[in-house]
Amino acid sequence: MSLPLPMSPGRSGFTPKLELSYDSGPGNGIFGFGWKLETSEITRKTDKGLPQYCDSDESDVFILSGLEDLVPILDATGARMMLPRTVYGTSYRISFYRPRIGGLFARIERWVAKDTGISHWRSLSRDNVTTLYRYDPTSRVADPTDPTKIFSRRISRSWDAKGNAAAYSYADEYGAGINQALAAEADRTAATCAVQTYLKTIQYGNLEPYFPGWTAATEAGLPSDWMFLAVLDYGDHGASPPTPTSDQPWPVRPEPFSTCRAGFEIRTYRRVQRFLFFNNFPQEPTSGANCLARSLDLVYSDQQAPADPRNPIYTFLVSATETGYRHDSGTLVTRSMPALEFAYSQPQIQPGVLSLDRESLGNLPEGLDGTRFSQLDGAISTIIADH
């Protein structure tokens, strides 16, 4: 199940292709249980164990966007192919990777700064689109005690051969609204709470072409004349009319959750309430600068049924509504499409204790002395026999 975001089309078809997708496997996220936003990132594989973060020994397997394992490219002697390069006054060691299964046809590079050991990644697609991962400090998830142990490198920016570019910005977790008096938060410090970062804005549709000069002494920086802006509202934007700038306190979701697959705790306190899409045409009298064009409003199960006892444990996305906006003589006119509603198969839990007749115990395993000890393990079905 997928839900494409209503992004305004960019020039030459260069538009971030983003969609919400549902899969019951990944668990909870910033869109409730099962939903996630399909964005590009490079992360460490955790299916067979915790990451070791010994990158010089290739102790971990990297994954591109959760799909393909990346393997290092070797030279004729069997050693890793590496290339030194200095860009913007920083010396790097560049190593090269390719997907384990062919078909992506992309050049994938890991750039490690010689002086700090901090790395970022770069990929060049077969369509000549360059993408940088963890190029900005906030586009990563790292160990709070060691910033060189980066678990996930998220997309920072991308551009094509025609000068079209897109920039992604992230918001750091800063602990606003967290009730430290709760038992679940008692042993957490400000540093451990601030590991998670949240995608906040996506800018694209630059007026001036973007061609970064890798041989220049200093970096020119990203364009500032973006025509389109997508904002993820975590409840920190006003209701009517919302603006691109956060102007409300950051609310805490009803069921914060943690994952420790990175080898350290990554705790998520926020949840996306809606997407806001702005057009920036200052010369247009009917539009102007940062004009709200449309939104995608999300409703969760705890908002639909506040008294549901499952709310402190998990919440589901139950509806998504696309709304269009038009500015008419200073008045904001809105019109919404019918809501897209979602229903889920709920687990059937048997809270009672049932009795089993003696005739049905004949084929149950027993110990040598006729006594069987059982471990009561959560909701797993268990039979307790008394001899």
What are these language model-derived features?
Residues 1-387:
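Conserved catalytic cores of ATP-dependent inositol ring kinases
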